[in-house]
Every structure is written in structure tokens, then in C-alpha cells.
Regions:
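Cofactor-/ligand-binding subdomain signature composed of acidic, glycine-rich
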Residues: 1-45
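Gly-rich Lys/Arg/Thr-decorated short loops/hinges at beta-loop-alpha junctions or inter-strand turns
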Residues: 21-27, 83-94, 197-202, 244-249
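Ferredoxin-type iron-sulfur electron-transfer modules in oxidoreductases and energy-metabolism complexes
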Residues: 29-46, 76-78, 84, 93-98, ...
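Conserved phosphate/anionic-ligand binding catalytic regions in large, soluble enzymes, centered on
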Residues: 47-68, 112, 169-181, 185, ...
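Short acidic, glycine/serine/threonine-rich loops at helix termini
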Residues: 57, 62-65, 91-94, 133-138, ...
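Histidine-anchored nucleotide/phosphate-binding helix
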Residues: 101-115
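Short amphipathic, charge-patterned alpha-helical segments
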Residues: 108-112, 259-276
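Hydrophobic alpha-helical positions that pack around
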Residues: 133-259, 271
Length: 424
């Protein structure tokens, strides 16, 4: 099994210095792209690979790039932004690359920027990732010194400047247009689309925003080809995937596995199964803003299409496991509390609706719920769903709540009829 994304990770997590990274094959994709490929060739190769965005939405990466205006009449400067604002609860896969192999992200950004002929790039980093910040700054400086960044890179005539921007620490900055507003020094609220960032993004110029893991895949696709990348997978969704697991399992962590590895294999073979004395009840498969899956779904492949067919989303591919000694009502209340705090307040349903939902869940968890509260929550959740809010924050926030009421309804009812939390 090939693991291109994690092959350079070292014991102890210390990243390779640039010369050792080059010895291991690093920056070969930059030399290949700038030396023997046209920008459109890089985009077409990524298109043929069928690489999908690894930040949650799963949009085809090459197709996204193709929307950027090209040619002599294209507006400049163009921008490439690496979304490293990994704020989704339960998600920590990108941190592994940011801390352990920063040059892989820089190389991915250079090749991707060349494909769209970007002039400037930004790594938009989560505020709490201090170790990643230190290592990225060092790696960027090394890349400049080696001639991979700056003016006339490797004598190609193409120039690319790269900057590290540390977020102020808001979940909303993970939404690409909220991120762009933050980069511009504005309040991190989402923008109306269209126009899309590919046409009018950062400071009104063409901009691509890609996830850390997405960008880290690009050099390997350029070096090895689209067919190779498609062959890494066990499913129609191509490549490998960084899967993460948290919760009461024996070995929580992150693993690079073929896309389409089943939920059961990830949980049992890699995460080591449940801790002694605990039983599996459910799992949120792709970060906190995705629907629960339960035991009947354990043999489903963890890929975009299969998880969607099961009624959830692959999202970030990092799972939060629910065991039989953890209260599902308390777990969902904790998530809704987070989302209510992180609402940007731009639209009324999200600003008012999420705190109201969190308040009602707290009452149920504290044994103060009333008959009819569940029907009220269900009805209210639909009003926070797709088509009712300005962006996807609120619809994502109510996904774990809606699925918890579907799969664990008896637990909610016991809180109301017993006037107490059975787990306390």
C-alpha cells in the first residue's frame, strides 16, 4: 500500500530539512511542472486524476482550477490560498502534515499556483497551531533560499510570493469567502455567490482556495500521473485519504489509507477498537458537522459517494466515536454549543436559531425538557437546513442533531420522561 502523503513523516514528528526533503524526491514536481509542462497541462493532469477537495465539500480540484481566467487578458494579481484553518471539531488530519511535512504543502502550493498562474499565495493557518506556524515559517524561508519561491523561479520566468497568515481564531474562517474577508482585514462573514472566488476573490481578483491535504496531493499526481493516483483507491473516488479517529478507542490517531477503506477497518484495525468495557453506538464520520452513522453502516466504504448514500457526508474524513457510556444528548448539546458560539451572526436563522437550539438541548439534558420538545427541535432544525441560511454553517450544525434524534430517540425521550440524564 502506497502512502505518498505521509511517507516523509519522521519518528518524533520532526520535519525534514529542505535538502533531505529534496533527497527524498521533494520539489521534483516543481522542476517537472516549470521545466516541461504548460500551466494548462498541470490543470488537465489534476482533472484526469479526479482529485476531489479534502476539506469537506469534495469538489473536483482540477475543475475548480479551470474556472480561473487564463491568458494575456486575465486580471492580475491572481491568488492561491491554502486553507489551513482546521477548526472543525474532531478534525486534526491537516495538522499532521502542517507540523510533520511543511515542505510538501509548500511544494503543492507552488505547482498549483503555476497551474493557475497565481502571483501570490497565502497559508491561512489556525491560530492555535503554534508549532505548525514555527515550522511553516522555517520551511518557507528555506524554499525562498533554495530558489523555489520568489522572482523567476528556477529560471522559468514565473514568479510566486508566499506568505503565512495566522487566523484570529474563528470557525467561520474555514468557509472560503469568510476566510477571504478575514485576509482582507474585514469581519469574517461569508460572501454572496456568484461571483465565485475563482473569478472575483481576494481583493476582487481571481482566487483559488484549497485545503492542506488537497494541495499536498498535487505534486504526487504531477510526478506519477493521473492513472497512478486513481489506482491508489478502493473506490471510484480516487487517491488515498487521511482518516482520523477520536473518542474512546484504544488508538486514536490519523492514518493514510486507500480512499474507500471501510468504517469497520478504520475503527477496528487502525484505531484498535473500543476501549475495554465499552461498546460502539455510533460515529460522526467527517467532523462535527456531519450526520451520525450507526452499527448497520460499519461496512460502508469511507468515500464521498458511499457515505452520502448512507445519509451522511465524508466531510474531513475524521471520525468522532460515540460509546455506550456516553450520553448522546450531552454530546450533541456540546456540539450545538460550539456552533452557536461560532455563528458569525450575519443571518437571522443562524444567529438566533442556533443559540435557541442549544438552550433547548441543555434543558433536555438537565431533565427540564417537556413533551413536544423533540417535535419542536425537529421542526426548528428544518428551518436551519439548506436554503434557509446564508451559508452552510447552520445546516451543517444541525446534521448531528437531526441524526441523533433519528438513531437515539429513546435516549432523548428518557431524559424528558425521567426528568434527568440517565448517564449522570
Amino acid at each position: 500500500m502506497e502512502t505518498p502523503l505521509t511517507k516523509n513523516l519522521q519518528p518524533g514528528g520532526i520535519p525534514l530539512p529542505i535538502r533531505e526533503f529534496e533527497t527524498a524526491g521533494g520539489y521534483q514536481a516543481v522542476r517537472k511542472a516549470l521545466g516541461s509542462m504548460k500551466p494548462e497541462d498541470v490543470t488537465e493532469t489534476v482533472k484526469q486524476s479526479t482529485l476531489q477537495g479534502r476539506g469537506g465539500a469534495g469538489f473536483p480540484t482540477g475543475l475548480k482550477w479551470s474556472f480561473v481566467p487564463m491568458g494575456e487578458q486575465a486580471p492580475h494579481p491572481k491568488y492561491l490560498v491554502c486553507n489551513a484553518d482546521e477548526m472543525e471539531p474532531g478534525t486534526f488530519k491537516d495538522r499532521v502534515l502542517l507540523e510533520g511535512d511543511p515542505h510538501s504543502i509548500i511544494e503543492g502550493m507552488i505547482v498549483s499556483a503555476y497551474a493557475i498562474q497565481a502571483d501570490v499565495g497565502y497559508v491561512f493557518l489556525r491560530w492555535e497551531y503554534r508549532l505548525a506556524e514555527e515550522r511553516l515559517r522555517r520551511a518557507i524561508a528555506e524554499a525562498y533560499q533554495a530558489g523555489y519561491l520568489g522572482k523567476n523561479i528556477l529560471g522559468s520566468g514565473w514568479s510566486f510570493e508566499l506568505y503565512l497568515h495566522v487566523s484570529a481564531g474563528r470557525y467561520m474562517c474555514g468557509e472560503e469567502t469568510g476566510l477571504l474577508n478575514s485576509l482582507e482585514g474585514k469581519r469574517a462573514t461569508p460572501r454572496s455567490k456568484p461571483p465565485y472566488p475563482q473569478v472575483s476573490g481576494l481583493w476582487g481578483k481571481p482566487t483559488i482556495v484549497n485545503n492542506v491535504e488537497t494541495l499536498a496531493n498535487v505534486p504526487h499526481i504531477v510526478n506519477n500521473g493521473a492513472e497512478w493516483f486513481r489506482g491508489l483507491s478502493r473506490s471510484p473516488d480516487a487517491g488515498t485519504k487521511l482518516y482520523g479517529v477520536s473518542g474512546k478507542v484504544n488508538r486514536p490517531g490519523v492514518w493514510e489509507l486507500p480512499m474507500g477503506t471501510t468504517v469497520r477497518e478504520i475503527l477496528e484495525e487502525h484505531a484498535g477498537g473500543m476501549r475495554p468495557g465499552l461498546k460502539f453506538r455510533g460515529v460522526i464520520p467527517g467532523g462535527a458537522s456531519t450526520d451520525f452513522l450507526v452499527e448497520e453502516h460499519l461496512d460502508i466504504p469511507m468515500d464521498f459517494a458511499s457515505i452520502q448514500k448512507a445519509g451522511s457526508r465524508l466531510g474531513t474524513g475524521t471520525m468522532i466515536v460515540l460509546d455506550d457510556r456516553t450520553c448522546p444528548v450531552a454530546m450533541v448539546h456540546n456540539l450545538e454549543h460550539f456552533f452557536a458560539q461560532e455563528s458569525c451572526g450575519w443571518c437571522t436563522p443562524c444567529r438566533e436559531g442556533l443559540p435557541w437550539t442549544e438552550k433547548l438541548l441543555k434543558a433536555i439534558e438537565d431533565g427540564q425538557g417537556d413533551e413536544g420538545d423533540l417535535e419542536l427541535l425537529e421542526r426548528h432544525s428544518k428551518l436551519l437546513g439548506p436554503g434557509h441560511t446564508f451559508c452552510a454553517l447552520a445546516p451543517g450544525a444541525v446534521e448531528p442533531l437531526q441524526s441523533a434524534m433519528r438513531y437515539f430517540r429513546e435516549d432523548f425521550e428518557r431524559h424528558i420522561t425521567g426528568k434527568r440524564c440517565p448517564w449522570r
